[in-house]
Each structure stands twice: as structure tokens, then as C-alpha cells.
Amino acid sequence: MALKLNSADLYTTLSTRDLDASTTRAAYNALDSAITLRVFDSLSEVVRQQNTPHAAISYRFVRAMQGPAMSMVRRGIAVNTKVRQDETERFLAIRAKAQALLDTLANAVWGPEHYTVVTKTVEWFTPIGKRSQPLTPQTRTVRVESDAQRPRGLNPNSDKQVLAFFNIALHFPVEYEIRKTPQGSVRTPSANGKALRKWGQARTKGPGVDARDRTIPAVRLAAPFVSLILTIRDADKMLSVLRTPLDPDGRMRCSYNVVGTENGRWSSSKSAFGRGTNLQNITPSMRRMFCADDGQWLISPDLEQAESRLVAGLVWQTTGDDTYWAACASGDLHTTVARMTWPELGWTDDQAANRKIANTPSRELPKFTYRDISKRLGHGSNYRGTPFGIAQAVGVPPNIVEDFQVRYFKAFPALPQWHAWCKRQLLDHQYLDTPLGRRRWFFGRPNEDATLREAIAFGPQSTVGELLNLIMYKVWSRSLLPQSDPAFLPLQLLLQNHDAFAFQVPLTTHLPTIINAVNGEFNSTPITFVRGGERRDLIIPGEFVTGFNWAYADTNPDPGKWTFSDGNKDGLIKWGGSDERIRTSPAVARSADFLGRPSAPSWR
């Protein structure tokens, strides 16, 4: 049967004809396909008429990304059910311990909860008539109210309780956040992580104490409560991932949206069947249950110091200053930055000695080394972060960030010049182009700091994501070649994690050969920067880790600082030319693994 349908009278035509369900669905599917083709033809003409190639480049690139994305969606990743159960028990124990301690401390602050207990009893009685004669016995309900009290505790997931505890019981000032509602943006009291951390850092003498009394020191009164609440909330997030439904074959799958963000990075969500979760948002400590299939190695490459190198390229392209480029090319960017930021520390010409100096604790902030400060604060300063904002994100006093930025921008004066160039570009054109040809229009107010910081971060972050996806695409394409082809790679893509991807190869594969071949794709994919008549190619080397599960193995000599009690011997380690380990925990758990499993680990 052939039907000629117009979209305007589709419903009337299909509802008045005597069509079976299969034919009706076929008609709808055909119309959807026809409309999609018409939209494609129209958009293709719009793209063709553009004066710049940016739209066409981006469109072709994201269409190509559907291949590796669908490959990973269909394959999924194996889940070690034994590790999954062990981790569930571990986080349940952590949560129970933290909740018990939080309830005890909260009860000491705001005391027990007073409530009314209502007791109802049914009793028989004999009513008396008008002439004092007994009538037929009847029943009645006697209601007795009595006052009682019980431990109040504190529910960390109840904003109402948390706000009452901090703002009323502890007398901390109310923190607000802007929430979007159908009626518009509304300023409401907040008990989110940012508000909790602010309360935790505040020093006070406590409720009922005269603030002018110098005999009582101010302390961080809320710190224990904040720590416990955040611990419980983190445990709840971990448990939600651990309890995520698996597919019938025991694997976890997600769906990837290759055009899910404004800067070209992918986004991830549940699979098309409602199972799985966002696999791009799994914390490092949660990754252990995700593993390679039995008989396979798990390999994960990423771009080494990619964002810093791209900032260096953009700074040179816009200002002509290559000081930061030279620092990135030195081999140890953060030590070089520390040396240029604190020249008074007695540096030498020996790279190993300088690394040792950079790893000494800072005088102003002993819990961080000079190298740590250079890494953490330098990253935020590259994107024009304010001292207050960086201090809040890193957890250091704002004056430390202010002092660092004075030194940092003195060592690299071209960075503020690049920020100024981005501001002019934003004000004049309201768009920016990346070195890979993606153009983004910014619809926020071009004179606002938030829009400017977003524009500054766009270039490096978008380029890192698309460069890694391009390399992943080239690697995936080689896995589709015939095995007789010299360029064939015997690998299977498993995951894409914004700035890294993961694949598996058989244990029989010669690891150095595979890693050298993949690294060759990194080295053959340069990013070109042009300034006037000069061109510079930036090659960002790949950094590889190998193992059997997705979490990192604990390498700290002190077992007390391990993430996992057993050190996660099957975890990822940095590739150093060889990996002779033998797998200890299979992907498909044996029955003996469950029968001999120890009891739930205690909270620590």
C-alpha cells in the first residue's frame, strides 16, 4: 500500500483510514525520515552560503563522532560485581558511622525534639437513661495526650533541617543562591556545598557568648558538622552509582551526546533503555568496579598538560610572547613556574634539585608545596580567575592567591594581554574561534566578567576536547581495518571521559607496540598557530596508564594514605615501557570470590 501524505493533514488521513498498527507506524516513520531529509537539505544550503568554513567543519566533525560514540554505547563496559558489592558495604558503613556521629553532635547543640504522644484506648461503658435506668452497654474511645521527647538528630539531605540547624541553632548568617523557576530567577536560602564550606571556615565564639569577650577564642564551630554532612552526601552519591541498574549481560552502558555542550565536549547520560548512568561523572575512587573484560588489558591515554600548552599557543598567537610556551616546553611546567614566581628560593641548574626545591612546603601555606601552588593557582589564573574565586575553589586564603598572581603575572606578563585581547574580540565581534576551527558565539553580556571568563576558557578547553576526540576517532578507524592491514589496531573503545578515553586490547597483544602506535597518532596530530607570516605547530604528547580496572593503583609507600585497603593491585599505573602484572580479580566473579569474601570493612 502506498500513501501520499502531507504533514498538515497527516492526523486526519491516518485516523480515517482503516490501517493496521504496523502500517500506521510505517507511515509515521517514513514521514519523520522525509522531514529529516528536508531539514538536512535546507541546513546544508545555509552552511554552504556561510562566508566562513567554521560551521561546515564543526558539522562534519560531530557527524563523524557518531561512529566511535555508537561503538562505545553498544559495547558498554564490564562491571566487577564482587567489587561493586564490597564498595557498597564500605560506603554504607562510612555513612552509618558519620550519621551516628552527626546525630550525637547535633543533639548536643539543639537538644531533643519535643513531641506529643497520643494514646487511644477503647473501653466499654453503660450509659444511664433519663429515668436512671441502665441502657445497653456501648464502647467509647479515650484519647490521652502526653508530652515526650526523642533525639532530634540531623538529616543532611533535608535543606529545611540543615538551614534551621545552622541559621537558628548555631546563629550563622543565611547564605543565598539564585534558582531558576518558571516565574524567573529567585534568590533563596541555600544549604548547598558552597554555603556549608563557608560556614565551616567561619570563626565564631558560638551562640550565647559575648563577641567582645577576649577570654574565649573564636573557633571554627561548624567545621565538624560540615565535614560530616559532606561525607554523608558524598557517600549517598557513591551509593547511587553503585546501585545503578546494570544491563542483563552485567555490563553498564550510557548514551553519549556528541553535541551536548556549547564548547564541543561530549555529554553523557543513562542509556536508551533507562539503565546505566553518566559515565563521564564517575569519581576516581568509584572507578574500581569498572574493568576490562577477562583476557584484556585496559589502557587509557590523555593529553599531557594540554590546557596549559594550548594557553601558551594562544598567548603567542595573540601577543607574540613565547615565555609561557618555553615554560611548557621545559619538561616540568609547574617547577618552572615555581622557579619564575619565587626566584628567591635558591634555584640551581640541576633539574632534579629544582624539583626538590619546588616540592618543599610553602612558608605562607605549609600544607601545600610551591609546586602545588603553581599548579592549582596557575590554572585558575590562566583563565582570569579572581583571588576570591580561586581561594574558594582551592581552599586557601585570598591573600595567598593575590600574592601569587602578582608574582605570576610579573613572570608571564603576556597572560593579561591575552585576556585583554579576548575582551576586545568579545566586545567587537561576540565570537571566538579555536585553533581547530570551531566558532562559538557568546550570547551573554559581552562586558560582564562572567562572559569574559567563559570566553577565555573556551579556546583551550574546547580544543583539548576536540583534539582528543580527533585522535580517538583515528584510533577507532584503525580498529575497523582488516587484520591483514599493517595499520590495523586490535582494540575496542570502552569510554570517553572528556579529557581521556579508554580502550581494551587482548593480553596476547604486545603492549609497547600498541601504545607506540596510539602515541603515533598523538604525535601526528599537531595544532597550528599562526601569527602574521609565522606558523608554529604544537604537538601535545600522549600520557598512558595501563591496568585491568579503571581506578588508579595505590603507589604511596604509606599504606595509611591508600584509597583502597588492598592497594588496588589491578589498577592503572603510569606506563613506563612495560607492565608485567597478572590480573588478580576477574571481570566475571567466581562463586568462590563471594563465598570467601571477608566481612564489610570498618569505617576509617
PLM feature spans:
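Conserved "right-hand" nucleotidyltransferase catalytic core of DNA-directed polymerases
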Residues: 2-282, 291, 295-297, 304-307, ...
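Secondary-structure transition/capping motifs at alpha-helix termini
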Residues: 46-49, 75-78, 93, 109-112, ...
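Short, contiguous acidic/charged loop-to-helix segments that flank catalytic cores in large enzymes
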Residues: 151, 241-247, 274, 286, ...
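Function-dense linear segments that define catalytic or interfacial modules
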Residues: 255-361
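Hydrophobic (often cysteine-bearing) scaffold residues that line and stabilize catalytic clefts
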Residues: 32, 307, 330, 334, ...
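Conserved catalytic core of nucleic-acid polymerases
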Residues: 67-74, 131, 138-139, 249, ...
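Extended, non-catalytic structural segments that build the interaction scaffolds
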Residues: 50-55, 151, 315, 319-327, ...
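C-terminal polymerase-core module
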Residues: 93, 112-217, 410-461, 508-604
